[in-house]
A protein has these predicted regions:
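Helical mechanochemical/support elements of P-loop NTPase systems and associated helical scaffolds
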Residues: 2-3, 50-57, 81-84, 107-110, ...
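Phosphate-binding loop that captures ATP/GTP phosphates
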Residues: 2-49, 55-57, 62
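Short acidic, glycine/serine/threonine-rich loops at helix termini
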Residues: 8-12, 45-47, 86, 140-141, ...
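Glycine-rich phosphate-binding loops of nucleotide-dependent enzymes
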Residues: 35, 58, 77, 90, ...
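Phosphate-binding/switch loop-helix module in NTP-utilizing enzymes
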Residues: 41-88
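Conserved catalytic-core segment of NTP-binding enzymes
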Residues: 71-72, 78-176
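C-terminal boundary of histidine-terminating zinc-finger modules
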Residues: 179-192
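Short, hydrophobic alpha-helical segments
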Residues: 200-212
Length: 212
């Protein structure tokens, strides 16, 4: 987690990672090893970085962290097609990319560029996820499509990549991020919890397929 590093807060990981023999030790949260730049800098500090600094930070998180054996390493990248993405693809062989977009046309422009970039860099695009797909009223249960609906699915079909699922705009998703208890742990059978678990299963299946 490099840009806008909030991973540690969302996972409830507190404190600073240990350093053993010059290498950062990932912090454990909910059975997952995690490292975020947010663990290393003051929470109020603004990280204003140029391209070379971004690439240096990515290299540090990849090379200077004692990750050990992992099933999957997930890297959260900022929107767009900038230095962070190019640096990562040059540093390690990527198993695949998941593109996340809200449904409206203006957001899908960036998603389209992301798909094109990864394809040009020979990185498998595992698919698109539609975030904030709809708002579910907690009182009456009515769904309101604040940002439109189905844009990511249509874009995926147009570009010939899989559609991985949709995540609704829900108060409990916001609350889980603030509390540091992932929704798939705190409320796995809630609407949001089911959405996350379904997408995770689809992504895991796609990763296994590309690995073979």
């Amino acid at each position: 987690d490099g840009h806008g590093p909030s991973l540690h807060r969302m996972m409830g990981a507190k404190g600073k990672p240990d350093v053993v023999e010059g290498r950062l030790q990932p912090m454990q949260a909910w059975g997952i090893c995690a490292v975020s730049l947010g663990m290393l800098v003051d929470e109020k500090a603004a990280m204003i970085w140029r391209g070379p600094m971004v690439m240096g930070a990515i290299n540090q998180l990849l090379s200077d962290v004692d990750w050990g054996e992992l099933d999957v390493l997930v890297v959260d990248l900022p929107p767009g097609t900038g230095d962070a993405h190019l640096s990562l693809t040059q540093k390690v062989p990527l198993g695949g990319a998941v593109i996340v977009s809200t449904p409206q046309d203006i957001a899908l422009i960036d998603a389209r560029r992301g798909v094109t970039m990864f394809e040009k860099l020979h990185v498998p695009v595992l698919g698109l996820v539609e975030n904030m797909s709809y708002f579910c009223c907690p009182n009456c249960g009515h769904n309101t499509e604040l940002f439109g609906h189905g844009g990511a699915r249509r874009e995926a079909e147009a570009m010939g990549v899989p559609f991985l699922g949709e995540v609704p705009l829900l108060a409990d998703i916001r609350a889980s991020g603030d509390s540091g208890v992932p929704l798939v742990i705190g409320a796995p059978n809630s609407e949001g919890g089911k959405a996350y678990r379904a997408i995770a299963h689809t992504v895991a299946t796609a990763i296994q397929a590309t690995a073979h």
